[in-house]
Amino acid sequence: MAQRAFPNPYADYNKSLAENYFDSTGRLTPEFSHRLTNKIRELLQQMERGLKSADPQDGTGYTGWAGIAVLYLHLHNVFGDPAYLQMAHSYVKHSLNCLSRRSITFLCGDAGPLAVAAVLYHKMNSGKQAEDCITRLIHLNKIDPHVPNEMLYGRIGYIFALLFVNKNFGEEKIPQSHIQQICETILTSGEKLSRKRNFTTKSPLMYEWYQEYYVGAAHGLAGIYYYLMQPSLHVSQGKLHSLVKPSVDFVCQLKFPSGNYPSCLDDTRDLLVHWCHGAPGVIYMLIQAYKVFKEEHYLCDAQQCADVIWQYGLLKKGYGLCHGAAGNAYAFLALYNLTQDAKYLYRACKFAEWCLDYGEHGCRTPDTPFSLFEGMAGTIYFLADLLVPTKAKFPAFEL
């Protein structure tokens, strides 16, 4: 872990240090808010210049145009500036011209551009275009019966797109029965693989991606179980306790002595502290398990995740969401919003302060340096989210 991160130069939480960032109610100080807002404007200009040389054919949420549309939609929600809505609209139109008709997910497939477009058309009172996008989104489910189950390329990533639409419309535009049907397929698929590979006694559910049993949020068990425990998926109490809980507990047993988690079941190397692999993604599963099952050990494990992230989360890979400081900071915000412990808000603010010096630490340049999940757009999204910490949610993942 240590080789992949910069040593954390910051003192940990104490009340007097925290007063520079937020007051006793958790409201950011005007000075810190001003610093964040100025940096957002500065990075937006840089990002817009950089996007001129981005791949014109990448319409995805993860590295392409739909991700930039998601950022501008978020900035419109935070600041209320109609110019941001227009920017989101122009980028999502670009993304709709790049649909692959292969993957069905929000981040790496056609569901992202269609879901974001539906929401934008709705906000712009273009009802017919919004309905057209929703119809196409619902029909995506028929593309590939052998689709995997994980977040980036699988059924969970499709479910996020459906929930994203319903949440932003404030009504059930996607029928609950459609979402339930996909959820049932995910459960059946997990039971089937668990039986086939003799995991049943340890974990009633099991999932793989490219013949690997991944553990983390992006491709693995933690991301899938985080969703299966969501109230909006309506998994029955019986199945939550007989299938999901023991499977979550199996993941908990994989914890390294450090408090971090492996990338795959058979990986004994304690290396990665990323949202995609390791504690910064597993923490969401643990927090949701604590909310659903009310057992203290899930909270303790989540707090251990936060300690690992504080120590090893300022990554040399950069400032992004998937494997960077901004994505890792969201873990602190999730724990802050669960516990109201000011220590976690302070830690998120310190990681934001690291991001305020964007480009000055000698980090690696990502393959797509201005994108939502690998690059600058994700950092901007995080800095804007931090302005109202109680509303902050990891984009395209957290519900």
Curated annotation (Swiss-Prot):
This is Glutathione S-transferase LANCL1. InterPro entries: 6hp_glycosidase-like_sf, LANC-like, LanC-like_prot_euk. Interacts with the C-terminal of STOM. Interacts with the EPS8 SH3 domain. Interaction with EPS8 is inhibited by glutathione binding. Its EC number is 2.5.1.18. It is found in: Cytoplasm; Cell membrane. Disulfide bonds: none annotated. It comes from the Eukaryota. It catalyses: RX + glutathione = an S-substituted glutathione + a halide anion + H(+); 1-chloro-2,4-dinitrobenzene + glutathione = 2,4-dinitrophenyl-S-glutathione + chloride + H(+). GO terms for cellular component: cytoplasm; plasma membrane. The modification N6-acetyllysine is found at K142. It is a peripheral membrane protein. SMART domains: LANC_like (SM01260). GO terms for molecular function: glutathione binding; glutathione transferase activity; low-density lipoprotein particle receptor binding; SH3 domain binding; zinc ion binding. Belongs to the LanC-like protein family. Functions as a glutathione transferase. Catalyzes conjugation of the glutathione (GSH) to artificial substrates 1-chloro-2,4-dinitrobenzene (CDNB) and p-nitrophenyl acetate. Mitigates neuronal oxidative stress during normal postnatal development and in response to oxidative stresses probably through GSH antioxidant defense mechanism. May play a role in EPS8 signaling. Binds glutathione. Keywords: Acetylation, Cell membrane, Cytoplasm, Membrane, Metal-binding, Transferase, Zinc. Glutathione binds at K317, R364, T365, P366, D367. Strongly expressed in the brain, testis and skeletal muscle. Expressed in the neurons of the cerebellum, the germinal cells of the seminiferous tubules in testis, in liver hepoatocytes and in cardiac myocytes. Gene3D superfamilies: 1.50.10.10. The modification N-acetylalanine is found at A2. GO terms for biological process: carbohydrate metabolic process; cellular detoxification; peptide modification. Zn(2+) binds at C276, C322, H323. Pfam families: LANC_like (PF05147).
